[in-house]
Amino acid sequence: AASLGFSSVIVDDGWQTEDNQRGYAFCGDWEPSKVKFPDFPGHVKRVQEMGLKYIMWFSVPYIGKKSRIWESFQDKLLYYDGFQQAGVLDLRYPEVREYLKRIYKRAVNEWKIDGLKLDFIDEFYLRKESPFFEEGMDCADIQEALNRLLTETMTELTAIRPDCMIEFRQRYIGPQIRKYGNLLRVSDCPGAGISNRIGTVDLRLLSGETAVHSDMLMWHKEERAEEAALQIESSLFSTVQISVDLSTLTERMRKLLIFWITFMKEKAKLLQESQLQPAEPENLYPEVAADNEGERLLVHYSGKRAVDLRQIPKQMTYIHGTKAEEVIFRTPKG
């Protein structure tokens, strides 16, 4: 991955268990599987020595019925989800918040990971079966308790590691979420380049200087490189996450990834830091541009759109992010 230009690896659900069934029955202990990772700190170190940062997924709310810690917290739940075989922890209990913070601090302190992907925080809300304020709680409002957890987590993790990355995804993203993390990702949309485009542009417009990531791009190993390129082009104004088996890449796909990753790094200031100029949100942003210090980058995501060359800066890059075979240019007279 590092040789292709990637800088980080995100380890998703599954590192904590050998079980491959749906649900979260084994969440809660947050111990790396000894079968998969006999020496987890050593594994993290080896990955980092390859030049990659290491980010781990954690499901914040779920505590599984098959976890060892279940007995300690089964009476401190907002509700139990039979389908997921897991309960949603009630953050109004201070010992619940402290337990979660210890887990995250241990991951940074002992395992030396570079960041955390904190998932499913939108599950923290009251249901009909949720308890009212009870003895032992120090917050009446679950949202206030969540605010305490996330604020303290950010403060304590960055005290250990100032550059610690904390990711949240789009379904529960708003301006306030920026104080809890520093990496905002588009909500799940596998194989949907248009959804990734809408999500990344929306987040860029709302997230200030906070880093915006695409949802993971994926494709079949026999997919045409041109189809994969369209997915990447749809997420150009974000940090692109790729989820494919790199060992199965064809040479053409490998060259494709190297080209676009190199391009995005070379144009990082223009793509990531410039003020976006997206057009026609009612049409799903078919045109997006960015300008910076005499340079302009324009992407068209639908056909029959004109590239205006009558007033251009010193340098202009045009990207044809559509299957349309024609490109229309408007040039100065003469």
Regions found by a protein language model. Give the residues of each.
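Catalytic domains of carbohydrate-active enzymes, especially glycoside hydrolases
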Residues: A1-E18, E110-D114
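Glycine-rich, aromatic-flanked loop segments that form ligand/cofactor-binding clefts
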Residues: F6-D13, V35-Q84, D163-F168, I173
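Flexible loop residues that form catalytic
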Residues: G14, I121, V240
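Aromatic- and acidic-residue-enriched carbohydrate-binding clefts of CAZyme catalytic domains
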Residues: W15-H43, S67-P94, E123-N147, T153
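Generic recognition of stable, solvent-exposed alpha-helical segments in well-folded globular domains
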Residues: V35-G42, M50, E95, Y99-R102, ...
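Active-site and adjacent substrate-binding regions of carbohydrate-active enzymes
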Residues: V47, V96-E156, C164-K179, L236
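Active-site-adjacent "subsite" loops/lids of carbohydrate-active enzymes
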Residues: K53-E110, N196-D202
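Active-site-proximal substrate-binding groove within the catalytic cores of carbohydrate-active enzymes
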Residues: L149-G334
